[in-house]
From Swiss-Prot:
Record protein name field: Protein-export protein SecB
BP-aspect Gene Ontology terms: protein folding; protein tetramerization; protein transport
One term of GO molecular function: unfolded protein binding
Oligomer and partners: Homotetramer, a dimer of dimers. One homotetramer interacts with 1 SecA dimer.
Gene from which the chain derives: secB
Summary of the function given for this chain in its UniProt record: One of the proteins required for the normal export of preproteins out of the cell cytoplasm. It is a molecular chaperone that binds to a subset of precursor proteins, maintaining them in a translocation-competent state. It also specifically binds to its receptor SecA.
UniProt xrefs under Gene3D superfamilies: SecB-like
UniProt source species: Xylella fastidiosa (strain Temecula1 / ATCC 700964)
Cell compartment(s), UniProt: Cytoplasm
Similarity remark: Belongs to the SecB family.
A single Gene Ontology CC term: cytoplasm
This protein's record includes keyword Cytoplasm: yes
Keywords attached to this entry: Chaperone, Cytoplasm, Protein transport, Translocation, Transport
Length: 172
């Protein structure tokens, strides 16, 4: 029997055999809430307009670790004035061991953002309510479809690029 205490964290890399996907850390990288026209904007009548911008960035940290940052900006305008702007950068470090490049791309493009999105949704909703505005809940996002669309666009761009480079240039 051992007196060693573990905290439930993943075993060291040497102990991992076969393809493995791990969540190493989830954290807030950056967060901002601005309500530049409050308190006057609280009295504005009419339907507010919302604009959502979502993107993600991946950085390879080492051979088997990747940081994915999910960046969401939500802007609400009422009567032509900015009611609020919420920006959240939710990040995670993920371990991807024994996987080929295609599998790594799929996990980073689909599963990792799916893991981070509930944190983003909660943080955005909390910030808006704490800022004095009615609740707003980000709706689910189909990251599988977004990833498939990204691959389709990338293939289309490569196809167009190869067509352009195969055409004669200038007055040949």
């Amino acid at each position: 029997m051992s007196d060693e205490i573990t905290n439930g964290a993943a075993k060291p890399t040497e102990a991992i055999s076969g393809p493995t996907f791990t969540i190493e850390k989830i954290y807030i990288k950056d967060v901002s809430f601005e309500a530049p026209n409050s308190p006057a904007v609280f009295n504005e009548a009419g339907q507010p307009e919302l604009q959502l911008n979502l993107n993600q960035r991946v950085q390879r940290l080492n051979e088997n670790a990747f940081e994915l940052v999910l960046h969401v900006t939500l802007t609400c305008t009422a009567a032509g004035k900015t009611a609020y702007v919420v920006e959240v950068q939710q990040a995670g470090v993920f371990g991807l061991f024994g996987l080929d490049q295609h599998a790594i791309g799929v996990l980073l493009g689909t599963q990792c953002p799916n893991i981070l999105f509930p944190y983003v949704r909660s943080l955005v909703s909390d910030l808006i309510q704490i800022g004095g505005f009615p609740p707003f809940y980000l709706q689910p996002i189909n990251f599988d479809a977004l990833y498939a669309e990204t691959l389709r666009q990338r293939a289309q761009n490569e196809k167009e690029g190869s067509q352009i480079s195969s055409q004669p240039a200038g007055n040949a």
